[in-house]
Amino acid sequence: PCVEAVEWLGDKAFDEAWATCERGDWMLWAYARLYYDRNRELVGCVAECVATAQHLMTDQRSVDVLKACKKYANGEISKEELLSYAIASYEAAEANADINAHAAAAYQAAHAAVNVHSATYAASAAAACADSAAAYADFAAARKKNLKLTADICRRLLPCS
């Protein structure tokens, strides 16, 4: 994903890296590349990561796309149905500049079904939402806390075997 991630990884074995990583965005990136055939699991996990910022979402379309992601992950709706929710969430982001990061995170969660880069972006956007919630009082701490939270979500929801 970036030089920082590669430097952190160093010579760590995959199991060690997965167990100790504190960046959900890096974990989603790795999982999407290693387990590209597990799309529903990935989208479900991305939705859980983005849901860490759901309390900041003020447009119902953004909340709806998170629910749709969970339905997709459970096999209840098709990829095409999920993408229709993603489009609605994108429209929410476009229409409301003040909630752009929150709506964009929800949109990217749904878009992860077709674009692996969206999974990483969604977790980063959730961390950015946490940053804005902290009103920049402790920007780095809020971001770090959210990335650690999403890393724990990844370990809980994504089987790496």
Annotate each predicted stretch with a short phrase:
Residues P1-S161:
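Short, glycine-biased loop/turn motifs at secondary-structure junctions and
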